[in-house]
Amino acid sequence: MKSHDLKKALCQWTAMLALVVSGAVWAANGVDFSQSPEVSGTQEGAIRMPKEQDRMPLNYVNQPPMIPHSVEGYQVTTNTNRCLQCHGVESYRTTGAPRISPTHFMDSDGKVGAEVAPRRYFCLQCHVPQADTAPIVGNTFTPSKGYGK
Protein backbone atom coordinates (compact mmCIF):
# COMPACT_ATOMS: atom_id res chain seq x y z
CA MET A 1 0.00 0.00 0.00
CA LYS A 2 2.85 2.39 0.78
CA SER A 3 4.33 1.83 -2.67
CA HIS A 4 1.02 2.83 -4.25
CA ASP A 5 0.85 6.05 -2.15
CA LEU A 6 4.44 6.91 -3.07
CA LYS A 7 3.73 6.45 -6.79
CA LYS A 8 0.60 8.56 -6.53
CA ALA A 9 2.47 11.38 -4.76
CA LEU A 10 5.31 11.22 -7.30
CA CYS A 11 2.83 11.45 -10.19
CA GLN A 12 1.13 14.45 -8.58
CA TRP A 13 4.45 16.27 -8.05
CA THR A 14 5.54 15.51 -11.61
CA ALA A 15 2.27 16.88 -12.96
CA MET A 16 2.60 20.03 -10.83
CA LEU A 17 6.18 20.59 -11.99
CA ALA A 18 5.16 20.16 -15.63
CA LEU A 19 2.34 22.65 -15.12
CA VAL A 20 4.66 25.25 -13.54
CA VAL A 21 7.33 24.88 -16.23
CA SER A 22 4.84 25.04 -19.10
CA GLY A 23 3.17 28.07 -17.50
CA ALA A 24 6.49 29.90 -17.25
CA VAL A 25 7.34 29.09 -20.87
CA TRP A 26 3.91 30.24 -22.02
CA ALA A 27 4.15 33.50 -20.01
CA ALA A 28 7.54 34.40 -21.49
CA ASN A 29 6.60 33.44 -25.05
CA GLY A 30 7.13 36.34 -27.43
CA VAL A 31 8.57 38.70 -24.80
CA ASP A 32 11.86 40.31 -25.86
CA PHE A 33 13.85 41.04 -22.72
CA SER A 34 17.05 41.91 -24.59
CA GLN A 35 16.17 45.61 -24.79
CA SER A 36 15.73 45.92 -21.05
CA PRO A 37 18.85 47.32 -19.33
CA GLU A 38 18.22 45.08 -16.32
CA VAL A 39 18.43 41.95 -18.46
CA SER A 40 20.96 43.04 -21.10
CA GLY A 41 23.51 43.97 -18.44
CA THR A 42 23.87 47.57 -19.59
CA GLN A 43 25.63 49.70 -17.01
CA GLU A 44 23.08 51.55 -14.89
CA GLY A 45 22.80 55.22 -15.84
CA ALA A 46 24.75 54.78 -19.08
CA ILE A 47 21.66 54.65 -21.29
CA ARG A 48 20.65 57.90 -22.92
CA MET A 49 17.40 57.67 -24.81
CA PRO A 50 17.03 60.25 -27.55
CA LYS A 51 14.17 62.64 -26.94
CA GLU A 52 11.44 62.10 -29.46
CA GLN A 53 9.77 65.44 -28.81
CA ASP A 54 10.06 68.47 -26.57
CA ARG A 55 8.43 68.58 -23.17
CA MET A 56 4.71 69.03 -23.58
CA PRO A 57 2.83 71.91 -21.96
CA LEU A 58 0.66 71.19 -18.93
CA ASN A 59 -3.10 71.57 -19.31
CA TYR A 60 -4.18 72.07 -15.70
CA VAL A 61 -2.82 72.79 -12.22
CA ASN A 62 -0.85 69.90 -10.67
CA GLN A 63 -0.95 67.84 -13.88
CA PRO A 64 1.84 65.24 -13.84
CA PRO A 65 4.27 65.93 -16.70
CA MET A 66 3.75 63.69 -19.72
CA ILE A 67 6.53 61.44 -21.01
CA PRO A 68 7.91 62.73 -24.35
CA HIS A 69 9.58 59.44 -25.32
CA SER A 70 8.80 55.74 -25.65
CA VAL A 71 8.90 53.60 -22.51
CA GLU A 72 8.65 50.30 -24.37
CA GLY A 73 10.82 47.71 -22.66
CA TYR A 74 11.22 49.74 -19.47
CA GLN A 75 10.95 47.70 -16.30
CA VAL A 76 9.21 49.26 -13.33
CA THR A 77 8.84 46.61 -10.65
CA THR A 78 9.17 46.49 -6.89
CA ASN A 79 12.90 45.78 -7.34
CA THR A 80 13.86 48.10 -10.19
CA ASN A 81 12.66 51.32 -11.77
CA ARG A 82 14.11 52.07 -15.21
CA CYS A 83 12.81 55.65 -15.09
CA LEU A 84 15.08 56.50 -12.16
CA GLN A 85 18.19 55.60 -14.17
CA CYS A 86 17.75 58.91 -16.01
CA HIS A 87 15.45 60.96 -13.78
CA GLY A 88 16.88 59.98 -10.38
CA VAL A 89 18.61 62.52 -8.15
CA GLU A 90 21.96 60.76 -8.70
CA SER A 91 21.78 60.73 -12.50
CA TYR A 92 19.64 63.53 -13.94
CA ARG A 93 22.59 65.91 -14.34
CA THR A 94 24.52 63.47 -16.53
CA THR A 95 21.52 62.30 -18.58
CA GLY A 96 19.94 65.71 -19.14
CA ALA A 97 16.56 64.36 -18.04
CA PRO A 98 14.28 66.38 -15.74
CA ARG A 99 14.89 65.54 -12.07
CA ILE A 100 12.24 63.65 -10.15
CA SER A 101 10.05 66.05 -8.16
CA PRO A 102 10.77 66.51 -4.44
CA THR A 103 7.12 65.61 -3.78
CA HIS A 104 7.96 62.04 -4.80
CA PHE A 105 10.01 61.64 -1.60
CA MET A 106 7.08 62.40 0.75
CA ASP A 107 5.16 59.58 2.36
CA SER A 108 1.42 59.62 2.99
CA ASP A 109 2.01 61.49 6.28
CA GLY A 110 3.96 64.25 4.53
CA LYS A 111 7.33 63.15 5.92
CA VAL A 112 10.24 63.56 3.50
CA GLY A 113 12.53 60.55 3.13
CA ALA A 114 15.81 59.84 1.36
CA GLU A 115 14.24 57.39 -1.11
CA VAL A 116 11.29 57.69 -3.48
CA ALA A 117 8.10 57.05 -1.49
CA PRO A 118 6.41 53.73 -2.30
CA ARG A 119 3.21 55.47 -3.39
CA ARG A 120 5.20 57.47 -5.98
CA TYR A 121 7.53 54.69 -7.15
CA PHE A 122 5.42 53.39 -10.05
CA CYS A 123 5.79 56.32 -12.46
CA LEU A 124 3.32 55.12 -15.10
CA GLN A 125 0.41 55.43 -12.68
CA CYS A 126 0.48 59.20 -13.25
CA HIS A 127 3.00 59.95 -16.00
CA VAL A 128 1.99 58.71 -19.43
CA PRO A 129 3.84 58.55 -22.75
CA GLN A 130 2.29 60.47 -25.62
CA ALA A 131 1.82 59.43 -29.23
CA ASP A 132 0.75 61.48 -32.22
CA THR A 133 -2.34 59.46 -33.13
CA ALA A 134 -5.99 60.11 -33.85
CA PRO A 135 -8.20 59.89 -30.75
CA ILE A 136 -10.39 56.80 -30.37
CA VAL A 137 -13.28 58.93 -29.10
CA GLY A 138 -13.92 62.63 -29.53
CA ASN A 139 -12.42 64.98 -26.96
CA THR A 140 -13.74 68.44 -26.12
CA PHE A 141 -11.30 69.11 -23.25
CA THR A 142 -9.87 72.62 -23.18
CA PRO A 143 -6.87 73.53 -21.03
CA SER A 144 -7.23 75.80 -18.02
CA LYS A 145 -6.60 79.49 -18.69
CA GLY A 146 -2.87 80.08 -19.05
CA TYR A 147 -2.12 76.39 -19.68
CA GLY A 148 -1.70 74.31 -22.81
CA LYS A 149 -0.34 75.40 -26.16
Swiss-Prot record:
The SS bond pairs are: none
Provide the residue positions that the database annotates as binding heme c 2.
H104, C123, C126, H127
Instruction: Name the phenotypic consequences of knocking out this gene.
Output: Deletion leads to reduced levels of formate- or glycerol-dependent activity after anaerobic growth in the presence of nitrate.
UniProt-annotated binding residues for heme c 1: H69, C83, C86, H87
**PTM statement from Swiss-Prot or TrEMBL:** Binds 2 heme C groups per subunit.
GO cellular component terms, semicolon-separated: nitrate reductase complex; periplasmic space
- Could you tell me the Gene Ontology terms of the biological process aspect for this record? anaerobic respiration; nitrate assimilation
The record's section on InterPro entries has: Multihaem_cyt_sf (IPR036280), NapB (IPR005591)
**Signal peptide boundaries:** 1-27
Lineage top rank: taxon? Bacteria
Q: Where is it located?
A: Periplasm
Query: One MF term in GO for this entry?
Result: metal ion binding
Q: Which UniProt keywords apply?
A: Electron transport, Heme, Iron, Metal-binding, Periplasm, Signal, Transport
- Which family does the record assign? Belongs to the NapB family.
NCBIfam families referenced in this protein's UniProt entry, alphabetically:
PRK11586.1
Q: What does this protein do?
A: Electron transfer subunit of the periplasmic nitrate reductase complex NapAB. Receives electrons from the membrane-anchored tetraheme c-type NapC protein and transfers these to NapA subunit, thus allowing electron flow between membrane and periplasm. Essential for periplasmic nitrate reduction with nitrate as the terminal electron acceptor.
Q: How does it assemble?
A: Component of the periplasmic nitrate reductase NapAB complex composed of NapA and NapB. The interaction between NapA and NapB is weak.
Q: What is this protein called?
A: Periplasmic nitrate reductase, electron transfer subunit
* Species per Swiss-Prot/TrEMBL record: Escherichia coli (strain K12)
